[in-house]
């Protein structure tokens, strides 16, 4: 078995899945993508943590966004592949 035939790799970590599910759900409910402040409030994260998380998701090809344009986040993962959005557990680390 060569590398291309190996077992499928998870598209994202459980934590990343929660961020993606939040962006997707927020967009459905509000008709627009969340602002960084919305993500900060929901997950109780600092601005630098949200920024780094979005960069990581973008590098992984899981979201797209237009730099300098607010609320331009688009989830590139099919809705059926996203996990259920759980309430954040503030007793655990919020890192990627």
Indicate residue ranges for each PLM-predicted region.
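Short, cationic-aromatic polyanion-contact patches
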Residues: 10-16, 35, 66-90
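Short helix-capping/hinge SLiMs at alpha-helix to coil transitions
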Residues: 25-31
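Short, Lys/Arg-enriched N-terminal segment that forms or immediately precedes the first helix
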Residues: 1-11
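A short alpha-helical element within helix-turn-helix/winged-helix DNA-binding domains
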Residues: 33-43
């Amino acid at each position: 078995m060569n590398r291309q035939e190996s077992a499928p790799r998870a598209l994202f970590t459980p934590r990343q899945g929660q961020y993606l599910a939040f962006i997707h759900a927020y967009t459905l409910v509000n008709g627009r993508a969340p602002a960084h402040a919305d993500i900060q409030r929901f997950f109780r994260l600092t601005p630098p943590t949200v920024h780094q998380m979005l960069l990581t998701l973008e590098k992984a090809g899981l979201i797209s966004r237009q730099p300098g344009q607010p609320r331009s986040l688009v989830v590139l993962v099919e809705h059926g592949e996203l996990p259920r959005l759980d309430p954040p557990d503030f007793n655990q680390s919020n890192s990627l």
